[in-house]
Amino acid sequence: MLRPLREFGPPLEDHLQPMPYTQVQQMFDEAWGIGRQYYVKAPWVQAISSDAIDTLVTHFAKVTSPLSLAVFFQKSGAMRRGPHDQTAFGHREARYALLITSMWLDRKESERHIRWARELSEAFEPFTSGGEYVNDLGREAEEGMARIKAGYGANYERLVALKAKYDPTNLFRHNQNIPPTV
């Protein structure tokens, strides 16, 4: 199944192995340098199938920057354990997150690099649980409220009630906002 990826070209890095969470968090510290432009999408992926790999290879054949990357992170441990309503974290059933990162240097080229990441994310829709990692969603003006709701999954309505109780004036709104009322 991984042969198409390996035949596409040599990876800059290959971390196909179990690793501690802290190591995962530090993997890209050096590569994500100061002055670079970024656009990130992170759909939750149910399974890495041959069709999913083919989709990835097809879109990387059209990549707009050699700095761009895509990484599958396997979800395990606390991210998948426990009832869905225990935390705000949605889509516990998804097995992977696909971190799609378009990275480039010249701010004037932003539109085409962002478009590439969005197109890859959209092409991956058939393989997802219907949501994305909330920290990698844009704001409502960019994403639309439906995508933000999908990011929180089944927890959204409960989070709206909590927001209405603890932040009824929507003071904390500069994020992937949950308004205090629907």
Task: Kindly label every feature range from the protein language model.
Residues 1-182:
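Soluble FAD-dependent oxygen oxidases
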